[in-house]
């Protein structure tokens, strides 16, 4: 069976993997989050890809969906547990990968729990594989370390220019008749926490997605919508990719209110527990499972 876009899938994985390994070395106390995010996104482009979504840098109890805003001054601190989640695409074929950096040196086991869960479940995949059984494996590994998997976060099957296709890979056991099989491109991302084991929505995290073109009164907002719909019709974008200065924020907010764009909320652990994450993209072929972001 020939897999559509195979070479591009593999190339996107190589780019994402290389950038992840380079970016990890930049994460240190006193370094600005913006510096790391811009390095990631620019490096992906240098290597011949495009960011599949804004670089996510989520610290401590934040599990996902924070990217630095325009002129963001936030810096890493020496007790931070940092999740770096990045994606690259080549002609729409996506690679999605994440790693946790423990600057505090107090959460080695938490980091190990999500990593071990990731590699264990990948090793156990035998297509067609029930996604509920995958969740069971992830849950058992994380719980064996004394932590909880985050039950309302999940991995996802990806298509060309589509990060989430409707099939999710749970981090806990679920009774389901959904399977992944040969030809599927899948992001698997176990999250472990010492908190409640669920996330809740926080404020907007500076990441947006185009929804539709609608009539807009404000000329500046119409212009901004044209830029967004032309450049980011399918995949998420960062506010700093489309705003030149703070005065344009009014236009962005009017697009959210008009449901022209969707703003992703930050996802926080429900009891402010510390969160660790590990993620790889896999491609299921007739010859077995390939980790594209290894």
From Swiss-Prot:
Q: Which SUPFAM superfamilies match?
A: Creatinase/aminopeptidase, Winged helix' DNA-binding domain
Top EC class per UniProt?
Answer: hydrolase
Q: Which reaction does it catalyse?
A: Release of N-terminal amino acids, preferentially methionine, from peptides and arylamides
Indicate which residues the UniProt annotation says bind a divalent metal cation 1: 85, 96, 279
GO terms, molecular function? aminopeptidase activity; initiator methionyl aminopeptidase activity; metal ion binding; metalloaminopeptidase activity; metalloexopeptidase activity
**For this chain's UniProt record, which GO biological process terms are given?**
proteolysis
One GO term describing the cellular component: cytoplasm
Q: Which residues bind substrate?
A: 65, 164
Tell me the subunit arrangement. Monomer.
HAMAP family this protein is in? MetAP_2_arc (MF_01975)
- The identity of this protein, by name, is Methionine aminopeptidase
Query: Which species does this protein come from?
Result: Methanocaldococcus jannaschii (strain ATCC 43067 / DSM 2661 / JAL-1 / JCM 10045 / NBRC 100440) (Methanococcus jannaschii)
